[in-house]
From Swiss-Prot:
GO terms for biological process: siderophore biosynthetic process. Induction: Up-regulated under iron-deficient growth conditions. Repressed by Fur under iron-rich growth conditions. NAD(+) binds at residues 122, 242. The gene is sbnB. This is N-((2S)-2-amino-2-carboxyethyl)-L-glutamate dehydrogenase. The active site is at residue 78. Disulfide bonds: none annotated. Its EC number is 1.5.1.51.
Length: 336
C-alpha cells in the first residue's frame, strides 16, 4: 500500500496564488473565527535555542503544531528556524522552514510545503485584519519599521487591501537597505509617496498605522511618539516600551496564553502588577466575530501584540494546498 503527499516549494506556492494577500486574509478569517469559538487545538510552541542564556532573541527554531476544526478541518505543524544575522552575514533570508499538513481523519501527512513565504504573508494578513478593525477608517499614512522580507510583505499586503494609503514612512537601522526598499517600492507604486526617514521616531510619529518588522531585542518605541488615533501592529514583539501597553487606550492580542508566556513583555507586566487579562481589550478573533468592538473613537491609541499562532500558518497552508491541487501544481512524493 502506497501513500502520497504533495511537495510545494516556494515557486509552487507563488504559482498557486500564495504571493497575494487575499488567500491569507480568507484563511485567517476562518482560523481566527475558530479561535474565538474555541474550535482549535494549539499547544504552546517550544523554542529550540543553541544558547538560551546569551543568544539573540531571533536565533531559534520554533515548532508550531495545531489542529483547526470547522468546515475545513486540518492538522499540521510549522517548523521554522531563524538567525538574526543571516541577511547581514550570509546574504540569506532571516527565517526558513517547512510546513507539514496532516489529514485529520487518518493523521497521515498529505503535504510538505516551504514555510517562510507562507509565514511572512500570514503575518501580514494579521496586520491587515487587525487594521480593518482597529485603524482609523480611511487612514492615509502608513509606517513600516524594518525593510526585510516581513516588512516587504506587510507593505505589499497593506497596499493590496487598502486603496486609500497615500504616504508610506520607512525606517531601517541600515540606511542603504531602507533606500533600496523605498526606491523599489516607489518604482512599483509611483502614485504613492514613499519616504525614507532619518530615525525610528520620525517614522513612528508620522504613521496613522505603524507596523514593526525588526529583529530588535530591546524596546525603542515610546508612547509619546504615537500620534492620536494611531494603531500600532507590534509584529516583531520587542519594539515597544512597556509604557505603551500601560497607556494605550486598547491592547489586543492574538492569544492571551501565548502572549503571557515567561519573559514576554506582557508576562513581565503581569508579574509587576501593571497589566492583567482583565485589562486586555480583546483577542483578535473576538473582533473578527463581532463579539467585541474594535476602534470606537478616532483618537484612541490601540496596540496589537500578536505572538503569531500555528492555526494561522496551518489554515493558510491548507488553503494554498487546495488551490495547488485544483491547478495540478507541485510534486507528488511517495511516502513509502
Amino acid at each position: 500500500m502506497n501513500r502520497e503527499m504533495l511537495y510545494l516549494n516556494r515557486s509552487d506556492i507563488e504559482q498557486a496564488g500564495g504571493n497575494h494577500s487575499q488567500v491569507y486574509v480568507d484563511a485567517l478569517t476562518e482560523a481566527l473565527t475558530a479561535h474565538a469559538h474555541n474550535d482549535f487545538v494549539q499547544p504552546l510552541k517550544p523554542y529550540l535555542r543553541q544558547d538560551p542564556e546569551n543568544g539573540h532573541i531571533a536565533d531559534r527554531i520554533i515548532a508550531m503544531p495545531s489542529h483547526i476544526g470547522g468546515e475545513h478541518a486540518i492538522s499540521g505543524i510549522k517548523w521554522i528556524g531563524s538567525k538574526h544575522d543571516n541577511p547581514s552575514k550570509r546574504n540569506m533570508e532571516r527565517a526558513s522552514g517547512v510546513i507539514i499538513l496532516n489529514d485529520p481523519e487518518t493523521n497521515y501527512p498529505i503535504a510538505v510545503m516551504e514555510a517562510s513565504l507562507i509565514s511572512s504573508m500570514r503575518t501580514a494578513a494579521v496586520s491587515v485584519i487587525a487594521a480593518k478593525h482597529l485603524a482609523k477608517k480611511g487612514f492615509k499614512d502608513l509606517t513600516i519599521i524594518g525593510c526585510g522580507l516581513i516588512g516587504d510583505k506587510q507593505l505589499q499586503s497593506m497596499l493590496e487591501q487598502f486603496d486609500h494609503i497615500e504616504r508610506v514612512f520607512v525606517y531601517d537601522q541600515f540606511s542603504e537597505a531602507c533606500a533600496r526598499f523605498v526606491d523599489r517600492w516607489q518604482q512599483q507604486r509611483p502614485e504613492i509617496n514613499f519616504i525614507a526617514t532619518e530615525n525610528a521616531k520620525e517614522a513612528v510619529s508620522n504613521g496613522e498605522v505603524v507596523i514593526t518588522c525588526t529583529v530588535t531585542d530591546q524596546p525603542y518605541i515610546e508612547y509619546d511618539w504615537l500620534q492620536k488615533g494611531a494603531f500600532i501592529s507590534n509584529i516583531s514583539i520587542m519594539d515597544v516600551h512597556k509604557e505603551v501597553f500601560i497607556k494605550a487606550d486598547k491592547v489586543v492580542v492574538d492569544d492571551w496564553s501565548q502572549c503571557n508566556r515567561e519573559k514576554k513583555t506582557i508576562n513581565q507586566l503581569v508579574l509587576e502588577g501593571k497589566f492583567s487579562k482583565e485589562a486586555l481589550h480583546a483577542e483578535l478573533g473576538q473582533l473578527v466575530t463581532g463579539d467585541i468592538p474594535g476602534r470606537e473613537d478616532d483618537d484612541e491609541i490601540i496596540l496589537l501584540n500578536p505572538m503569531g499562532m500555528a492555526i494561522e500558518d496551518i489554515s493558510s497552508a491548507y488553503f494554498i494546498y487546495q488551490q495547488a491541487q485544483q491547478q495540478n501544481i507541485g510534486t507528488t512524493l511517495n511516502l513509502y
